[in-house]
Amino acid sequence: MASNLDAVQRLVFAVIHHDDADTAGQALVEAGHRATRIDAQGGFLRRGNAVFMGGVGIEQVDDVIATLRSVSTHAFGQSGTGSAYGIVFVVPVDAFDRL
């Protein structure tokens, strides 16, 4: 989700429905964001899902979320909890480097 090491100020974790993962990955690339995808099951959404994570600048967070929201079409629903298309966590980054 970032190409400039100095610009990485936030780490974005996005958990989305597995059926939206390929489209989401492509949309992130087309929007100029780099991300790592991890396929997972269980956890917050209780079904097959994908976790995208990547470092971004503060000014890119809203664009990443909007990009993911625009391609998320499969809702997760649980009895009594309503439904959601995904969950996004944004965490401050103190340091970032590539090995």
Question: Where do the PLM segments sit?
Answer:
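Positively charged, small/polar-rich N-terminal and surface patches that mediate targeting and assembly
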Residues: 1-99
